[in-house]
């Protein structure tokens, strides 16, 4: 069990100015007036994930989305190493993705950074050590991030990934197990909403 309060975490994205907390439960994204916005964890988003990889069954979001300009830097929240990285090419998938591994008092924790730029993975390598606050990636554009508006999908996992992928949305029938396996990213990001 992780004692989250014993650890100090660096910001993952420097959100400049005010931001909007999105309500994506209606299944569509409406552009906010702020430069940055946040999509919620444990949010049902029926109708939003309509590409073949979701099969209409998966629409419970188990990460946090931080939306902002293309090229926005993404930083490591604590000391760790790169566990996996790669490109998921299917429409609606992550596009470029990096997964980092961290030790929190003897418990392994993985963090997925999804919807990244091509540049983010060009010189990446598994086992690369990362420091708190180190820029490890950048928000990707539509053509490289799975076809989404520019944002970071940030997700924690207590389950070791076998590749550069984790389910960012699950079936509502899997909610109980998914929330155990993929803890609330606000434990690291702080109270975004």
Question: Language model features by range: what are they?
Answer:
Residues 61, 102, 115, 151-153:
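Histidine-centered active-site/metal-ligand motif
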Residues 56-90:
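Short, glycine/small-residue-enriched coil/turn segments at secondary-structure junctions
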Residues 67-69, 119-124:
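Short alpha-helix capping/helix-loop boundary micro-motifs
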Residues 1-15, 122-144, 148-193:
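Acidic, glycine-rich catalytic/binding loops that coordinate metals and/or anionic ligands
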Residues 67, 74-75, 113, 128-130:
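Small beta-strand-rich domains/subdomains or short beta-sheet motifs embedded
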Residues 66, 80, 100, 133, ...:
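Terminal peptide-recognition signature
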Residues 76-120:
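Zn2+-dependent peptidoglycan hydrolase active-site motif and core
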Residues 1-69, 175-193:
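Polar/charged, compositionally biased leader and regulatory segments
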């Amino acid at each position: 069990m992780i004692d989250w309060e014993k650890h100090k975490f660096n910001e993952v994205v420097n959100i400049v100015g005010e931001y909007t907390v999105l309500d994506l439960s209606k299944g569509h994204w409406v552009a906010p007036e702020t430069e940055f916005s946040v999509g919620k964890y444990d949010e049902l988003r029926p109708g939003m994930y309509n590409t073949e990889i979701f099969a209409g069954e998966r629409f419970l979001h188990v990460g946090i989305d931080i939306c902002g300009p293309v090229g926005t830097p993404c930083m490591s929240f604590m000391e760790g190493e790169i566990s996996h990285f790669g490109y998921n090419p299917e429409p609606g998938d992550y596009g470029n993705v990096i997964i980092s591994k961290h030790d929190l008092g003897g418990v392994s924790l993985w963090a997925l950074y999804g919807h990244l730029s091509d540049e983010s993975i060009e010189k990446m390598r598994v086992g690369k050590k990362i420091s708190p606050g180190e820029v490890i990636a950048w928000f990707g554009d539509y053509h490289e991030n799975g076809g989404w508006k520019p944002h970071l999908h940030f997700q924690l996992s207590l389950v070791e990934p076998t590749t550069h992928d984790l389910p960012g949305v699950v079936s509502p029938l899997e909610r109980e197990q998914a929330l155990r396996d993929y803890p609330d990213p606000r434990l690291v990001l702080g109270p975004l909403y």
